[in-house]
């Protein structure tokens, strides 16, 4: 699919609006078409996707997909964007039983099974944990103004900032201990985090949606939005959100 849209000339034209209200680019639409064709082979599953919303099925399974997480990176050719797929037995975060994130840039494949651990390219994660004293904080943001406003609040909280452009991948990197905390300055949807949150939780790392229901009760839909904080412990998450809220 990406080979058919090799540059931003082909990838960035806006072809519509997603159900969530964001513009749908050509690369978003092409990726979603491919993944939905595959997922619709799962008999009876309800599919929840950023672009088309909810496609109701008759079965118990719910598949939550973000065909391109990191759309701006994808359309500009920056190799840090991902496919994110979560499979759930119900309608909330606690019901997610499987998560899969594919990094289109590196080719890394991240997977998690509820109560079965998390893996990177088949190798178990969890040995390298994020540091409680935050050396690297991954910000996820869209506007320069929001970064400028909140970065000052991180002085004394985090040593270095990274803004990489894919919330799902940033959470995967947290699960692997590559970064020490993740904060989204823009409110995220369930499709952005449904798969990656399972990797984080299976590694015993804290994650919260401070502006939503209790994390496990957060609905797997395209309507709800909240900022996301994730770090080594609940206490670190609370301190981060308090600093961001000043």
Describe each region flagged by the PLM.
Residues 62-95:
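Glycine-rich active-site/cofactor-binding loop and its immediate structural neighborhood
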Residues 1-68, 241-246:
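N-terminal subdomain of lithium-sensitive/metallo-dependent phosphomonoesterases centered on the IMPase/IPPase/PAP
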Residues 46-50, 65, 74, 120, ...:
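General beta-strand structural signal in soluble alpha/beta enzymes
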Residues 28, 39, 71, 112, ...:
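Residue-level signal for inorganic ion chemistry
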Residues 82, 86-172, 223-246:
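Acidic beta-strand-loop-alpha-helix segment within the catalytic core
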